[in-house]
A protein has these predicted regions:
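Short, Lys/Arg-enriched N-terminal segments with co-localized hydrophobic residues
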Residues: 1-16
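Flexible coil/turn and secondary-structure edge motifs
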Residues: 18-19, 23, 38-239
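Bacterial N-terminal signal peptides
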Residues: 26-37
Length: 239
């Protein structure tokens, strides 16, 4: 987040400033539109299902779907997810800071690293959640009010199986016309994931009344609970 209409960003000190009253009114009016956007029917599940592992373990997935606050808020409430981190992928290490990423010159996308137990949830189900409630995969280089390549839709795969499943699911959804427009999600190998600054971690949890969270992210969490009740779990950060 950084180029949004609902917040002001203090570029001199990486401080997120409170909203002006006029923006609060705009955010309140937009809330109904945001809620409606995630009230649609559940999209079809992946036809190609990755089987659950026979024993507990840890696997890594990395997704980019606009502002990482909301993407993290969704995946940390999915059963089988062990940990999440907000961060940056797609650019170089020396530009992996919020102040640089919001300039839209680094190649980074705001992304979320998802550590999950493959004996509890499959990569296919994570893809289903990602395309169903975490973001709109038909928006090119933006997500809602956030505009720029750092807000692009992307899947950073960590192995050939993740690449195969992601590409197959996108082809399936396009063929089934699951969305009004074609999916623009990039599927690209993960070169590196750089953890974002601490104040971005668990942001939606610690700032539930921030108008941006109310408008853009609460509807996603509500949609997850409504559309995937068997996967939804309450979340509380570990101390």
């Amino acid at each position: 987040p950084g180029s949004v209409d609902f917040r002001r960003y203090h570029k001199s000190g990486d401080v997120l400033m409170p909203l002006a009253p006029s923006l609060r009114r705009a955010a309140a009016g937009f809330l109904l539109l945001a809620a409606a956007a995630f009230a649609g029917p559940l999209i079809p599940p992946p036809a190609t299902e990755a089987p659950l592992a026979s024993r507990p373990g840890k696997e890594t997935a990395v997704f980019a779907g606009g502002c990482f606050w909301g993407t993290q808020a969704v995946f940390q409430r999915v059963k089988g997810v062990l940990a999440t981190s907000a961060g940056y992928s797609g650019g170089e290490a020396h530009t992996a800071t919020y102040r640089q990423v919001v300039t839209e010159t680094t190649g980074h996308a705001e992304s979320v690293q998802v550590i999950y137990d493959p004996s509890l949830i499959s990569y296919s189900k994570l893809l289903w959640v990602f395309f169903s409630v975490a973001h709109d995969p038909t928006q090119l280089n933006r997500q809602g009010p956030d505009v720029g390549t750092s807000y692009r839709s992307a899947i950073f795969y960590t192995n050939a199986e993740q690449e195969r499943l992601a590409k197959a699911y996108i082809a399936q959804l396009d063929a089934q016309k699951a969305f009004p427009k074609r999916i623009v999600t990039e599927v690209t190998p993960l070169k590196a994931f750089y953890r974002a600054e601490n104040y971005h971690q668990d942001y939606a949890y610690y700032n539930p009344d921030n108008p941006y969270i109310e408008v853009c992210d609460r509807p996603k969490i509500a949609a997850l609970k409504r559309q995937f009740p068997e996967l939804f779990v309450d979340y509380k950060p570990k101390k």
